[in-house]
């Protein structure tokens, strides 16, 4: 037995010496595959950004194309497809009154406001499929073959094939954001807004902060939120941009946001916050400010009081009235240049 083990050892050693280069290459390939597998399993694919979805999800993108909700004489005309660069033809893919656009794989998902349905269709608009009924007009998000959506104020999830419908919470959730393997959400409790988190099954609930704002977003390892206070002396609301760690620690004010902020329009990128607020003569304007609280910049004035701000790459899409006084989607660079109607 001992001699057999010695012979086996010698055989392995001799094979390694004779094929050292091949063995090292094979080990390197295996190592790369293992690393790729680990990284790949940790990457989440989102159908749209959280900031866009909390602004009606008017625009979603895939590759060099955008899909957006179009208006005709102030009424929703359907969902259209166009090139990001603004060149080439514009194609109508659906006449549906749909919002909260998500794109995952070769499918587009949205909420039909007329029928309160969650719809899935191919990117060319064909083969519509109803995934869920009694869906609220509120943000949906498609993440890794799951769709998160509201029925009333209750949060649910369902597979993209329409199976495994699961209720995640019975709380009256105001806002939610799926981040990796967790869901961050806000709800009202005793007149104050709580920010909490749970896992993707609705379990392991943890309160993060019990006096934060309704409007929040997770960016990197921080939670940003708007602290809204009523000034009794001046009879007006005051707004603060605040931040804290994802565990609720190190809460601090970043800056004041002056003026009548429309908190429902808040959108964000990795380094900036976007929002609409009142300016003089009862008009509104869309602004940006860096997440460190510096360089507030007015991007564009708008005629509509209620707005929705969507961002794709370096472009911002928003609602405004055209010369006839009808609501329409406009596109402008985030630096305020190249403003035009879609």
Show which residues each predicted segment covers.
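N-terminal intrinsically disordered, acidic low-complexity segments at the extreme N-terminus
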Residues: 1-6
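Sequence signature of WD/YWTD-type beta-propeller architectures
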Residues: 31-34, 38-342
């Amino acid at each position: 037995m001992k001699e057999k083990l010695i012979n086996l050892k010698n055989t392995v050693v001799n094979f390694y010496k004779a094929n050292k280069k091949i063995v090292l290459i094979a080990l390197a390939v295996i190592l790369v595959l293992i690393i790729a597998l680990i990284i790949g399993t940790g990457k989440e694919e989102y159908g749209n950004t959280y900031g866009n979805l909390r602004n009606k999800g008017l625009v979603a993108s895939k590759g060099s194309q955008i899909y957006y909700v179009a208006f005709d004489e102030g009424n929703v005309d359907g969902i259209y497809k166009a090139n990001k660069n603004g060149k080439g033809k514009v194609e109508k893919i659906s006449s549906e009154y749909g919002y909260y656009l998500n794109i995952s794989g070769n499918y587009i998902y949205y909420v039909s406001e007329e029928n309160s349905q969650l719809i899935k269709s191919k990117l060319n608009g064909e083969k519509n499929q109803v995934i869920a009924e009694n869906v609220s007009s509120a943000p949906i998000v498609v993440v890794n073959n799951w769709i998160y959506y509201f029925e009333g104020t209750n949060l649910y999830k369902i597979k993209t094939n329409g199976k495994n419908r699961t209720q995640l919470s019975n709380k009256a959730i105001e806002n939610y954001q799926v981040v990796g393997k967790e869901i961050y959400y806000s709800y009202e409790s005793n007149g104050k807004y709580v920010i909490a988190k749970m896992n993707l099954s609705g379990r392991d609930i943890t309160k993060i902060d019990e006096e934060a704002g309704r409007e929040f977003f997770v960016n990197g390892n921080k939670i940003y939120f708007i602290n809204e206070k009523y000034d009794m002396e001046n009879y007006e609301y005051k707004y603060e941009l605040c931040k804290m760690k994802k565990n609720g620690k190190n809460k601090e004010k970043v800056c004041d946001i002056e003026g009548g902020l429309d908190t429902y329009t808040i959108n964000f990128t990795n380094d900036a916050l976007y929002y609409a607020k009142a300016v003089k003569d009862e008009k509104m304007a869309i602004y940006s400010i860096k997440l460190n609280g510096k360089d507030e910049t007015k991007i564009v004035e708008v005629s509509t009081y209620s707005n929705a701000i969507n961002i794709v790459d370096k472009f911002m899409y928003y609602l405004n009235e055209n010369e006839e006084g009808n609501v329409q989607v406009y596109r402008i660079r985030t630096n305020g240049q190249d403003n035009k109607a879609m």
